[in-house]
């Protein structure tokens, strides 16, 4: 019998937050690059590409961490670690996902290919960075930001000031929310020697997260003022600021389950700012 349930969990399709956190910045970029009206074709290419590459990243991560995950309470029952999915099955799934992503890539301009290659290389590198890099979230930030330049190029736009602002917003956002995520596993990671910004930032973790959130949310104001955005953008911006404040409240006591909840709440921030960008460009 084919272990469909195990495959779904290996690809994290049962946990769509990862897909959403990769999709929202790409959607922001598509809306910015197309003045609020991206084509259906572009939307479908990038949406499916997001799902395929995020799932591929999960498979790569689980292959690399299969001997580590059994020592972490949250990950010890992942399909590869528990034996529900074999290593050969995981490689076959990875091959299928990469081929599907390549087929989508062929529909985009050639310059998108270069960023896609960078994205794949970083995706393969990231799990191993947790062994030797004190801040592997920096690598994750690059990997999860490659959809932004690809969206601009696919839309026929240069990598302009909008791109720079958005890239900085997303890069900072990723480091902030993934540090929250890493705070969930901090005790286990310290025992087994896995590195993360949650460990590297030490007692300054909450302060640095707060500074990153203030920085990136302020950049949205810079963008909005430059675009002469109407009042409804600022209303949604204030709503999103409330979400960030709630996240900071959740992580204040550094309770693992609350840190994980704070990470999940990031999805609401991405959604609200997607609406804000869309309305600002109408």
UniProtKB/Swiss-Prot annotation:
The keyword Cell inner membrane applies. It is an enzyme of class 2 (transferase). Keywords: Cell inner membrane, Cell membrane, Magnesium, Membrane, Transferase, Transmembrane, Transmembrane helix, Ubiquinone biosynthesis. GO terms for molecular function: 4-hydroxybenzoate polyprenyltransferase activity. It is found in: Cell inner membrane. It holds the Pfam family UbiA. Its EC number is 2.5.1.39. CDD domains: PT_UbiA_COQ2. Its cofactor is Mg(2+). The chain crosses the membrane at residues 17-37, 40-60, 90-110, 113-133, 135-155, 163-183, 207-227, 231-251, 262-282. It catalyses: all-trans-octaprenyl diphosphate + 4-hydroxybenzoate = 4-hydroxy-3-(all-trans-octaprenyl)benzoate + diphosphate. InterPro entries: HB_polyprenyltransferase-like (IPR006370), Prenyltransferase (IPR039653), UbiA_prenyltransferase (IPR000537), UbiA_prenylTrfase_CS (IPR030470), UbiA_sf (IPR044878). PROSITE patterns: UBIA. One of its GO terms (cellular component) is plasma membrane. GO terms for biological process: ubiquinone biosynthetic process. Pathway: Cofactor biosynthesis; ubiquinone biosynthesis. It is a multi-pass membrane protein. Catalyzes the prenylation of para-hydroxybenzoate (PHB) with an all-trans polyprenyl group. Mediates the second step in the final reaction sequence of ubiquinone-8 (UQ-8) biosynthesis, which is the condensation of the polyisoprenoid side chain with PHB, generating the first membrane-bound Q intermediate 3-octaprenyl-4-hydroxybenzoate. NCBIfam families: ubiA_proteo. HAMAP family: UbiA. Belongs to the UbiA prenyltransferase family. This is 4-hydroxybenzoate octaprenyltransferase. It comes from Legionella pneumophila (strain Corby).
């Amino acid at each position: 019998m084919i272990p469909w349930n195990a495959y779904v969990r290996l690809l994290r399709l049962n946990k769509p937050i990862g897909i959403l956190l990769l999709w929202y910045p790409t959607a922001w970029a598509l809306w910015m690059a197309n003045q609020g009206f991206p084509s259906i074709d572009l939307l479908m290419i990038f949406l499916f590409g997001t799902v395929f590459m995020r799932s591929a990243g999960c498979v790569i991560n689980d292959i690399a961490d299969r001997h580590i995950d059994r020592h972490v309470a949250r990950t010890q029952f992942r399909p590869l670690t528990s034996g529900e999915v074999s290593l050969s099955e995981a490689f076959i799934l990875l091959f299928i996902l990469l081929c599907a992503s390549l087929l989508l890539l062929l529909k985009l301009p050639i310059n998108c290919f270069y960023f896609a290659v960078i994205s794949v290389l970083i995706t393969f590198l990231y799990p191993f960075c947790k062994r030797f890099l004190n801040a592997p979230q920096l690598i994750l930030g690059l990997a999860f930001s490659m959809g932004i330049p690809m969206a601009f190029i696919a839309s026929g736009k240069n990598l302009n000031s909008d791109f720079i602002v958005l890239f900085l917003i997303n890069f900072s956002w990723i480091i902030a929310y993934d540090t929250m995520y890493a705070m969930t596993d901090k005790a286990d990671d310290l025992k087994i020697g896995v590195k993360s910004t949650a460990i590297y930032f030490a007692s300054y973790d909450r302060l640095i997260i707060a500074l990153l959130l203030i920085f990136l949310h302020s950049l949205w104001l810079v963008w909005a003022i430059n675009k002469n955005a109407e009042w409804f953008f600022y209303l949604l911006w204030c709503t999103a600021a409330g979400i960030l404040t709630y996240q900071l409240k959740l992580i204040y006591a550094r309770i693992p389950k609350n840190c994980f909840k704070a990470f999940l709440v990031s999805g609401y921030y991405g959604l609200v700012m997607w609406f804000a960008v869309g309305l600002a460009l109408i």
